[in-house]
């Protein structure tokens, strides 16, 4: 049973789901905003906030965990340099999900995820 599981399955096998979320997290940290489906946006929010929390901690162990998750090593170093000054006074809620118009092909709910 899947009681109290944090990440939705997104109709993908575990390895594909993890790769998708890693890619979306990397893209969100790099660009600052990503357009995706609403279900993926909600799953992405958890992973991105976890990476920013690691960056706020700033320890070597946190840096290594973030490097193991995010695809771009230089992006992790830049995140760790800027996270404390950008999110130092904020206790979570680093991302914002804004719903947009449904996708034209299959009418699925779309959303924009952006860093606050």
Swiss-Prot record:
Gene3D superfamilies: Ribosomal protein L17 (3.90.1030.10)
Gene: rplQ
UniProt subunit comment: Part of the 50S ribosomal subunit. Contacts protein L32.
Cellular component annotations (GO), alphabetically ordered: cytosolic large ribosomal subunit
PANTHER family in alphabetical order: LARGE RIBOSOMAL SUBUNIT PROTEIN BL17M, RIBOSOMAL PROTEIN L17
InterPro entries associated with the record: Ribosomal_bL17, Ribosomal_bL17_sf
UniProt keywords, alphabetically: Ribonucleoprotein, Ribosomal protein
The protein's name in its UniProt record: Large ribosomal subunit protein bL17
A GO molecular function held by the record: structural constituent of ribosome
Superkingdom of origin organism: Bacteria
Organism in which the protein naturally occurs: Prochlorococcus marinus (strain NATL2A)
GO biological process, one term: translation
Keyword Nucleotide-binding: no
Family: Belongs to the bacterial ribosomal protein bL17 family.
